[in-house]
């Protein structure tokens, strides 16, 4: 199988040195993406295209090659072709008839020819000769240049003829590795996954940082979607996944910061931490999935206040996107199902968030915050290459859910204190303890290890995530309480 890869159009208008550098990078990426399918793959470059040749004959492997190339940044489109030495017009006609003759009976068709190099004929002369010959010899209904039922396409390059069988769309953008690198703040929801995709599609190597607010299970869920994005759109490059434990940071905010400023303060803490990670990794910008006024922390005044904590460039590729458009894109790229089951935590910590944050006020609220907590979170951050995070998913533990409380078991209400106060959990004959989600991981070890504990929250999401984390920490006496 031979493929002709056409580069993204914006590459073709670059200066000669830049264009050559981008083409070389794209060739390198294609080899990396397809290496496991064909170690002997040949990729050779020309000024405006690359020729990819494989001896692999397995149909499944070929389909996988096509799929991977459609998801490789830097490719405008690519063609499946058969290559022949260039002969005379009769030879060209014979080759086209051999490939398309059985498709033309009773159909309208058009012949399209592109040329590169010096020849004694024009592209139009080739089209006319081949078109009239095919119409005469193949029983075609006629020639229709505007809306043909069949297109007979070919390219002539110097002394070679390429008969084109199929054209596949590319992802566009620039080759990964040709531009700068960024750090994506990844929550695993619709917005952050689509924002990451947009940056990767444009051609920027995108590393991931995750601020863990919800326990081990949430972390694993984000690892899973990060691995998916890397494998599908960025596998040609080495990408890092950094996880920062932020439960203690959230606890500090909840206990010391005014309710209306909790969300803005949390985002500022995330940007502070992300900037430190980006600086350490020598990355050029931060990327978030924020869109104007989608939630309270994303108003222009709030975004302005949030950005003041960092000198690092903050990119927001979705800033003017509608939520439905973001969801549609997530479905298109395959992250929607991940996001649909991935809870967003930023909204659970503030009841009456401000939409008009004032710099002096947020600075006053942050003066109550013990910055040593943020430093500890950064010190405890873990880093691994994203291709290895999937290994950790295999070490996952299942969480048992129960609908009834047995004698001797204790139910722990992990909801936010406001929810506990508004709707107290009262179960007849059952001991209920209140231990908010942001404290459960640090304080669970203080509980009697000989008792059985059932974690409870309204929807079962937070309880499941924290039970999962505790199980992975070695606590076998924890389940999830999900009343019928």
From Swiss-Prot:
- Record has Nucleotide-binding as a keyword: yes
Write the protein's name. tRNA sulfurtransferase
- Residues engaged in binding ATP: 185-186, 267, 289, 298
Which top-level group of life is the source organism from? Bacteria
Q: Which residues form the active site?
A: 457 (cysteine persulfide intermediate)
Record domain THUMP: where: 63-167
Which EC main class describes this enzyme? transferase
Q: Which UniProt keywords apply?
A: ATP-binding, Cytoplasm, Disulfide bond, Nucleotide-binding, Redox-active center, RNA-binding, Thiamine biosynthesis, Transferase, tRNA-binding
- Kindly give the Gene3D superfamilies that the UniProt entry links to this protein: 3.30.2130.30, HUPs, Rhodanese-like domain
This entry's Enzyme Commission designation comes to: 2.8.1.4
- Give the record's GO CC terms: cytosol
Q: Which HAMAP family match?
A: ThiI
Q: Which NCBIfam families match?
A: ThiI_C_thiazole, tRNA uracil 4-sulfurtransferase ThiI
Q: Which InterPro entries match?
A: Rhodanese-like_dom, Rhodanese-like_dom_sf, Rossmann-like_a/b/a_fold, ThiI_AANH, ThiI_fer, ThiI_N, THII_Thiazole_biosynth_dom, THUMP_dom
The scientific name of the source species is: Pseudomonas aeruginosa (strain ATCC 15692 / DSM 22644 / CIP 104116 / JCM 14847 / LMG 12228 / 1C / PRS 101 / PAO1)
- CDD domains, sorted: PPase_ThiI (cd01712), THUMP_ThiI (cd11716)
